[in-house]
């Protein structure tokens, strides 16, 4: 696995964890374990949906304050990963039970998991309707990013990537 691919997979891990109501605890051990689980899923989503490599930049820079994610394919990738992780119900809404269990399984306590669920639920309800599920997911992701930055919970991707690369 080359350094760029590893960096992209680590970024995907961080984003999926946060977007799918994962864990705001960005400890290297948690991130490394998640990377092993999500890297393959991202590759599967890219192949299944014929997604372009342009999503790499969005995943690598997602948490950078001021970076604007606007690529529809990124929304499609997030949606696909969320489905693979059973984080959304058949209507495309967050599956609260599965998301809560996922968050707690990866280190979030009850209060943190509930707060993250509330943020995503509020973002689902506050983003404008969109018949394009990928663009709707992208809007929810951007809302979530904004709220996480307000809480100062955004991960420092340079530190996370550095820790994971040291383990590879």
From Swiss-Prot:
Cited InterPro entries: Odorant/phero-bd_Lep, PBP/GOBP, PBP_GOBP_sf
Domain of life from the UniProt record: Eukaryota
SUPFAM superfamilies for this protein: Insect pheromone/odorant-binding proteins (SSF47565)
Signal sequence, renumbered to the chain: 1-26
S-S bridge residues: 45-80, 76-134, 123-143
Known function: This major soluble protein in olfactory sensilla of male moths might serve to solubilize the extremely hydrophobic pheromone molecules and to transport pheromone through the aqueous lymph to receptors located on olfactory cilia. PBP is also found in sensilla from female M.sexta antennae.
Protein name: Pheromone-binding protein
Species: Manduca sexta
């Amino acid at each position: 696995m080359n350094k760029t691919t590893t960096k992209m997979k680590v970024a995907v891990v961080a984003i999926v964890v946060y977007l799918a109501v994962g864990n705001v605890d960005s400890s290297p051990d948690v991130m490394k374990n998640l990377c092993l689980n999500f890297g393959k899923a991202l590759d599967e989503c890219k192949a299944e949906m014929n997604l372009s490599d342009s999503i790499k930049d969005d995943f690598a820079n997602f948490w950078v304050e001021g970076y604007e994610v606007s690529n529809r394919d990124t929304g499609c990738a997030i949606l696909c990963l969320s489905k693979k992780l059973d984080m959304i119900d058949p209507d495309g809404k967050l599956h609260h039970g599965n998301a809560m269990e996922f968050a707690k399984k990866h280190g979030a306590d009850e209060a943190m998991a509930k707060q993250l669920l509330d943020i995503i639920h509020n973002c689902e309800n506050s983003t404008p309707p969109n018949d394009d599920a990928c663009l709707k997911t992208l809007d929810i992701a951007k809302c979530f990013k904004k709220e996480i930055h307000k809480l100062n919970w955004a991960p420092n991707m340079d530190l996370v990537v550095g820790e994971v690369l040291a383990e590879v």
